[in-house]
Amino acid sequence: MASSLTHPPPPPHLPSLNPKPNFTRRSLLLTSTATTLSFPSLSSSAIQPPNPTITDRIFMEFSLCPNYYLPNRTLGDTISTLCSDSTLLGRVILGLYGNLVPRTVSNFKSLCISNPNSNPNSSSYKNTLVHKVLPGQYFLAGRQGRPDRGEVRPPSYLPRNTETVDPKAFALTHSRPGIVSLSLSENDDEDEIKFDPEYRNVEFLITTGPGPCPQLDNKNIVFGTVLEGLDVITAIASTPTYQPGERIRQFNDLAEFFGDERAQNARAIWNRPLTTIYISDCGALEVTKPSLTPSLP
């Protein structure tokens, strides 16, 4: 009997795992077009440039007071009572960037238009000190504390400023004299005030020149510029300040190393003007039309 041989079916055809590509100019063009349509690139609309439009104008008048640190002052004396014969240093006009950092500008403006004479419990920059001057860099004002010491009453009623943690708020740089900035890295409010849950930072700095201050960039919020009165800023910057000797600095560094709190208290008077400079008046001015920041030297 003849037996028939059975043959197994042929294996299925498997495509090559690494087929040789067959590219043509047309296929490359179509692939490139499809990729462009499917994955749009980052455009200028995705990353918005800073908007330094001046939406608000503020005036500040700075004065010199010869009597503020007299030894015979009483406990109830304030700048308004001690400095009745002060000398006006000049008026400064500030332009604020309300579109870029609206909350920072709003809080700053609130303390400029507040009137402590009509409401003793309100917070205001009026009758507060320029408490620190760093020659060739900037000066600080708006330190919080006791009004009788020329400090700003803590403004716990202000809205919380969430721009301090918003990267977009740090877009502008301290590139020239006359930059107005919310002091964050240079803030020297006492820890007792900073640790209050209702703490609102209102300390500010103004760069004095002659050069830029790149060490302030990305650490403090630029929210305005000096429009008029740069000569007043220069006069404040030229005021003599208290500078400790090298031996005192070494002792202070050693005390800080060992955690002595008195080291920080001692540094509070470093760079303090030897002549009392204070904000004798401040308020808002009308803005007829928002404008871009002018170029300053």
Segments the model singles out, each with a brief description of its role:
Residues A2-P297:
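Cyclophilin-like peptidyl-prolyl cis-trans isomerases
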